[in-house]
A protein has these predicted regions:
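Secondary-structure end/capping motifs
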Residues: 221-305
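Short, glycine-/small- and polar/acidic-enriched structural segments
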Residues: 19-153, 159-163, 168-171, 178-184, ...
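Short, solvent-exposed loop/beta-turn-alpha elements that line the ligand-binding surface or hinge
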Residues: 47, 94, 203-206, 277-286
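Pocket-lining segment of extracytoplasmic ligand-binding domains
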Residues: 80-81, 89-90, 166-259
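Positively charged n-region of N-terminal signal peptides that target proteins for export
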Residues: 1-4
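Sec/Tat signal peptide C-region and signal peptidase I cleavage site
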Residues: 14-18
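Conserved C-terminal helix/tail region of periplasmic/extracytoplasmic solute-binding proteins
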Residues: 292-327
Length: 327
């Protein structure tokens, strides 16, 4: 786990400098957090009067436990994680009923099933060990669906909990697992080194609401201004990132936060994450159709089995709408 601190100070206004509002954010490491890197480096958080402490999580269980314990205020996490824990289908339980919700989007799809070089077909994965973050959350259920529709029902392969994408990619490249689901752009380096893409969520299952902004409802109700400031900063950073005039500087920022990344890989990461059909969502707008895909998969594979309500049960875009009204 790596933690870094951004000290952001608001501009001089009147006879005194206002104190920044403190915010604790937990994210997954890697290029999927590029807008966060930009918001830090280019001062978008500072302009909103925020002092943001950012923690990179080793996995989804640590992240959700932390936000429920009050160690973190906001999480950038898959929409399905929020559904799982709200429905009692997650990897852990809490002393109080969870009040997690999603307040904005972040990333659509960009999920790949990456396999060892010697794996040519889905049938080759039978009886093999596959790496997952957690057994019942995140992208594991997507992998169940992908494998089953290609002839491999649950039970025809083994699963190993490994935590976030970075840990799983490491296990894959070390030969400890045969396959894993990877969030872009972290599939690029393995593919360059001969690992194969066996499946792609967007082409095989349709749009999928992946990374989303989430918090506890109780925290959001008592900190609406901080939440709206975060949303404005994130959206502004995303707009700056997508502007082609900022391509070179954006690449420099990427390399600063993810050291030793070759320029060619950063260019491929930009291509993957700024695709017209998937990647960073314009203005971080939540995608109901992508959420429906996630809910359909969870309804099929979630344990205990249950009917799930409409996506609106887990989402409140009020803070998002108010934030961008003032932008």
């Amino acid at each position: 786990m790596r933690t870094f601190l951004l000290l952001a100070f608001v501009l001089f206004c009147g006879p005194a400098i206002a104190q920044p509002a403190h915010l604790k954010l937990i994210i997954f490491p890697g290029g999927l957090s590029w807008p966060i890197f930009v918001a830090q480096d280019k001062g978008f958080f500072a302009r909103e009067g925020l002092e943001v402490k950012v923690t990179e999580t080793p996995g989804s269980v640590f992240q959700i436990k932390g936000i429920m314990a009050g160690d973190f205020d906001i999480a950038m996490t898959p929409f399905d994680n929020i559904v799982a824990y709200q429905e009692g289908q997650g990897e852990t339980s809490f002393d109080v009923p969870p009040d997690l919700f999603v307040f904005m989007g972040g990333i659509s799809s960009t999920l790949r099933l990456i396999v060892q070089p010697g794996i040519a077909t889905f049938a080759d994965l039978r009886d093999k060990t596959l790496g997952v973050d957690a057994l019942s959350t995140g992208y594991t259920l997507l992998m169940y669906r992908l494998l089953e529709q290609n002839g491999l029902p649950p039970g025809s392969y083994k699963l190993e909990r490994l935590g976030g994408t970075a840990s799983r990619v490491k296990a894959l490249t070390e030969g400890r697992i045969a396959a894993t689901m990877v969030s872009s752009p972290q599939e690029i380096l393995p593919e360059q080194n001969g690992f194969r893409r066996l499946g792609d969520i967007q082409s095989m299952l349709g749009r999928y609401q992946a990374l989303s902004g989430a918090a506890r409802r109780s925290w959001a109700a008592s900190h609406p201004n901080q939440l709206q400031s975060f949303i404005r900063a994130y959206v502004a950073a995303g707009e700056w990132l997508t502007d082609d005039q900022n391509r070179a500087e954006a690449a420099t920022i990427y390399a600063r936060y993810i050291p030793n990344t070759p320029d060619a890989l950063i260019a491929k990461a930009r291509e993957a994450m700024l695709s017209e059909t998937e990647g960073f969502q314009p203005r971080a707008k939540f995608d109901p159709a992508g959420a429906q895909t996630a809910l359909a998969v969870r309804k099929q594979y979630g344990v205990p089995k249950k009917d799930l309500p409409d996506w609106r049960t887990y989402v409140d875009e009020t803070f998002y709408d108010e934030a961008l009204k003032a932008k």
